[in-house]
Each structure stands twice: as C-alpha cells, then as structure tokens.
C-alpha cells in the first residue's frame, strides 16, 4: 500500500479515536494489523501523528490555554487556572516517569488491550450509573479536589486500551463534574501530558527516523489534525445528548473483534 494512503488511513483513525472514549491505541493496532503497517516505523509514526491530534486541541482551546498562563481572561469570575492542570497532571505524570519502560514492556500487547477495552467499558457504565448531580457544570466550576480526582483516573490511561477520555470523564462524573466540563478538562489536560509522552517516545526512537519517511509522517500528521478537530467539536456537542454508555458497548464489540482477529 502506498505511503500516502497509509498516512491518510492511520491519521484518520488516530484523529477520530484519540479523544473519543473508545481507545485510540486499540484502533491503531487493529487498523495497522489489517493494512500490514505494524513494524518499528509504525510505532514512531503513531507518536508523530498524535502530535497532530494534540495540535487540534490547541487550536480549539487556544483562548483557554492562553488564559492558563495569564494572557487574556475567559470569564470575569473564578476560572480554571494553571494549578488545576498541574494538579491533574501529577498522578499520571509521576507513574508515567517511574514505570515508562515497564508499561511499554508489559501492557503494550493484544492481551492487555483486550482486557482494558472491557474494563474501561465497565468503568464507564459504572460511572454513569452511580454518578450524582453535578456540582461543576462548567469548566470554570471545577475544584482542585475534582481536578485531582480526574488526574487519578487519568492514571488508568497509561494502560493502552483504557482510553484517556473514557477514564477521565468517568472520574469526573464520579467526582460530580458534568459530562461536558469533564470532557473539556480532559482535552486541555491531555496537551501537556501527550506532548511530554510523545516527546519522550520520539527521543527514544530517534534512530528509527528517516528523511524518506517525511511524506508519510506529514500526511498522517495533517490528516490526524483535521479529523481530530472535527471529532472533538462533534463529541462535545454529542455529550449533551448521549452519555458514555453507548461508547462502552462499542468497546465490548471492539474487544471481541480484537480477540478474534489479533490474538
């Protein structure tokens, strides 16, 4: 298959699934397997196109991101600030640094991904069933305690297949944060976390990179960016009408497909 087509297909899958609670890792592994793109180059490619998805968040939430560092103000009252983000980053950041190699060796495989797809789906159903009325209906109403709770749930996203948004939105619901506010916080929180993780992976995989792969990486990056933009905007609108449960059932189906076609 031509590199440009691989770039478009994989970039579209990454952009569509990175911020939905369905596991981008599971979809990337499955798609790569189906089109025969699953070598060492593919691993570096996935890191690069993740940056395209991150750029989509930066573009959509640029005013909010500027306000976090004291440039501009999105509301006259109390608002989300940089400390909310730092608090949310600490749990997964610490675990990620301490156990980065172990996570890559133990959890990056078909078996662990199938388990996490199912476990993540169950978590989402439980969160919907046992969540109480929201005390934080907007992003600016999130407390430091709620930010820390969401950050703790983000630790689950270190397990490939669990889904960052699925884990953190579920944590937000259990901490009495609304669906939309939890999702928006999740997307903003993902920017520093994913940049750090992708940067670390790129440094460790630098010797695999080749100038011959630039067209492939560029195509995937641009595709992931465009599709992620559309996916984020659509998902935020959808959350006001549809809860996490349908995504949980989809994860169960994906786990079955993964089990029969990959394992």
Swiss-Prot record:
Substrates-to-products reaction catalysed: di-trans,octa-cis-undecaprenyl diphosphate + H2O = di-trans,octa-cis-undecaprenyl phosphate + phosphate + H(+)
Instruction: Name a GO CC annotation attached to this entry.
Output: plasma membrane
The record ties this protein, via PANTHER family, to: UNDECAPRENYL-DIPHOSPHATASE
Q: Tell me the GO BP annotations in alphabetical order.
A: cell wall organization; peptidoglycan biosynthetic process; regulation of cell shape; response to antibiotic
Q: Does the keyword GTP-binding apply?
A: no
Localization recorded for this chain is: Cell membrane
Q: Which family does it belong to?
A: Belongs to the UppP family.
Query: What EC numbers are recorded for this enzyme?
Result: 3.6.1.27
* Superkingdom in the source lineage: Bacteria
Q: Report the protein name in the record.
A: Undecaprenyl-diphosphatase 2
Protein task: Catalyzes the dephosphorylation of undecaprenyl diphosphate (UPP). Confers resistance to bacitracin.
The cross-references to Pfam families, in alphabetical order and at most eight, read: BacA
In the record, what terms sit under GO molecular function?
undecaprenyl-diphosphatase activity
- Bilayer-crossing regions: 17-37, 42-62, 83-103, 106-126, 142-162, 183-203, 216-236, 242-262
Swiss-Prot/TrEMBL keywords = Antibiotic resistance, Cell membrane, Cell shape, Cell wall biogenesis/degradation, Hydrolase, Membrane, Peptidoglycan synthesis, Transmembrane, Transmembrane helix
Membrane topology, as annotated, equals: Multi-pass membrane protein
Question: Which EC class is the enzyme in?
Answer: hydrolase
- Give the free-text miscellaneous remark of the entry: Bacitracin is thought to be involved in the inhibition of peptidoglycan synthesis by sequestering undecaprenyl diphosphate, thereby reducing the pool of lipid carrier available.
Under the heading InterPro entries, the entry gives:
UppP
């Amino acid at each position: 298959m031509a590199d440009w087509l691989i770039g478009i297909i994989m970039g579209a899958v990454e952009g569509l699934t990175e911020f939905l609670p369905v596991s981008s890792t599971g979809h990337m592994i499955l798609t790569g397997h189906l089109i025969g793109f699953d070598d060492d180059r593919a691993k570096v490619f996935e890191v690069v196109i993740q940056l395209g998805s991150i750029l989509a968040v930066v573009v959509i939430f640029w005013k909010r991101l500027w306000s976090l560092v004291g440039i501009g103000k999105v509301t006259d009252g109390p608002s989300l600030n940089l400390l909310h983000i730092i608090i949310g980053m600490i749990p997964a950041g610490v675990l990620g640094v301490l156990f980065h190699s172990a996570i890559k060796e133990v959890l990056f495989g078909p078996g662990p991904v199938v388990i996490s797809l199912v476990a993540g789906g169950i978590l989402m159903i439980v969160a919907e069933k046992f969540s109480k009325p929201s005390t934080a209906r907007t992003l600016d109403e999130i407390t430091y305690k709620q930010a820390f709770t969401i950050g703790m749930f983000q630790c689950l996203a270190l397990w490939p297949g669990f889904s960052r948004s699925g884990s953190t939105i579920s944590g937000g619901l259990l901490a009495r944060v609304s669906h939309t506010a939890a999702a928006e916080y999740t997307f903003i929180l993902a920017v520093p976390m994913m940049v750090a993780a992708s940067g670390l992976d790129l440094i460790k995989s630098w010797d695999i990179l080749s100038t011959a792969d630039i067209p492939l990486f560029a195509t995937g990056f641009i595709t992931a960016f465009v599709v992620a933009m559309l996916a984020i905007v659509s998902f935020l609108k959808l959350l006001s009408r549809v809860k996490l449960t349908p995504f949980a059932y989809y994860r169960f189906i994906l786990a079955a497909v993964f089990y029969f076609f990959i394992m």
